[in-house]
């Protein structure tokens, strides 16, 4: 594999926004209706349009206080403001929205600071009803302190097409059993993993029957009481509990055959592994976790330990992994991440037959990440001093149904005040029939990249309003095909794409730690 480089100091110019705008009425499940304005000429020409907008709640949790650090997190505010560690977002964040038949399911935490309950909403597109279940569990907070918000503690969500069960994994950040002398001070003994699931058919019940009673209580020896819906393992066997320790970032996927897969990160930022498991709908139980790569890589012969920042995805019938590496070597050029790495499995469940981007067999579980490295974004900045290159955020990847492979990443100088400061956004892509990657800096950057059909999309917010850019798979020829220009302004959101539609789950801009959530369904104009 070779890299074809197309560097450019000039970012691509976005397509001029359309000349004509028209107000579109928006469907809402609330008493008051909302209106959004989008470019009508742009939307009509590309077949991309806002299908509906629905308010899900008026009060979801958001962190509105000060960002704390390792020197200040033990002294959070005792007032109404909600201080936090890492980021402000916890609702409409992570793997929080999934369509199923004529329903859309969404997870969130209840606002404000004193509430924090795990919540599950179901929007019935036929009746227009949003029905919400409140769970007893409340957001744990950073290292078990509920006064410090923790943005990593997202709520992963899935619905099984095979039996209509609902699955949620939530509110954890590498928690383990420890004692008073440990990092978590014994706060997570027999409570370090949180899994909730429903009885079969719960996803399909009438609106008035969608209640907490459809979920299965924990009656095991580690149950925390009669209203405990949290299970310590996904296998139903407490002897497996060590397999469910120290995990973060739950994410579910569904195969074309309706099988559910799930993965999480085991370990920490610079010493971690991706673990995945599968749901057996007939037995109504999940398998134990299987590693994609080994943690503690030095003990397996590698020169250093490393962690993963990216995603495992199930696309086109294959389990795939794309990530950037965070090395435990703190004296190299990279302050945080480096590299672009990719692998896929030809086994339907990912249990072997793993290959690099060129189709060559790799070691499984992986130890030496260089076996699957594609290129080094840090090479686009020539700084050589330790920790001088900053790569955080702006990384994602996808594969079209034609097998066009795309990666995006962002790199800059760590010191923003240095005289030779550099900042570069990169798009690397390989069309399905091409042997080599094209790597271009003629790219304005993005946080995520998506696919539907043979097209790729960048979807996000501009001035608080959703926009969509589209390009043909295997190219860098993006154009703006949708831009909302008025209506509710949003702070952030998370996106799930399925059957040619983007389910954009959004938090409204506002003040305080209890803010509204909305669901926009955007038709991407993809034939299906």
Swiss-Prot record:
What general EC class does the enzyme of this chain belong to? lyase
Places the protein is found: Cell membrane
* This protein's UniProt keywords: Calcium, Cell membrane, Lipoprotein, Lyase, Membrane, Metal-binding, Palmitate, Signal
Annotated thermal dependence: Optimum temperature is 50 degrees Celsius. Optimum temperature is 35 degrees Celsius.
Keyword Membrane annotated: yes
Query: What family does this chain come from, according to its entry?
Result: Belongs to the polysaccharide lyase 24 family.
Q: What does this protein do?
A: Ulvan lyase involved in ulvan degradation. Ulvan is the main polysaccharide component of the Ulvales (green seaweed) cell wall. It is composed of disaccharide building blocks comprising 3-sulfated rhamnose (Rha3S) linked to D-glucuronic acid (GlcA), L-iduronic acid (IduA), or D-xylose (Xyl). Ulvan lyase catalyzes preferentially the endolytic cleavage of the glycosidic bond between Rha3S and the uronic acid GlcA, but not IduA, producing oligosaccharides that have unsaturated 4-deoxy-L-threo-hex-4-enopyranosiduronic acid (deltaUA) at the non-reducing end.
- What EC designation does it have? 4.2.2.-
The lipid modification S-diacylglycerol cysteine is placed on 30
A Pfam family annotated for this UniProt entry:
BNR_4
Name a GO CC annotation attached to this entry.
plasma membrane
Description of pH dependence:
Optimum pH is 8.
State the taxonomy lineage.
Bacteria, Pseudomonadati, Pseudomonadota, Gammaproteobacteria, Alteromonadales
What is the topology of this protein in the membrane according to its UniProt annotation? Lipid-anchor
Q: Which GO terms describe its molecular function?
A: lyase activity; metal ion binding
Tell me the residue numbers annotated for binding Ca(2+) 2.
329, 332, 334
- Site label Neutralizes the sugar carboxylate group at subsite +1, positions: 265
Q: Which positions are lipidated as N-palmitoyl cysteine?
A: 30
Signal peptide from the UniProt entry: 1-29
Name of this chain's protein: Ulvan lyase, short isoform
For the ligand (substrate), the binding residues are 151-152, 309, 326, 390
Entry binding sites for Ca(2+) 1: 218, 228, 230
Residues of the active site are 152
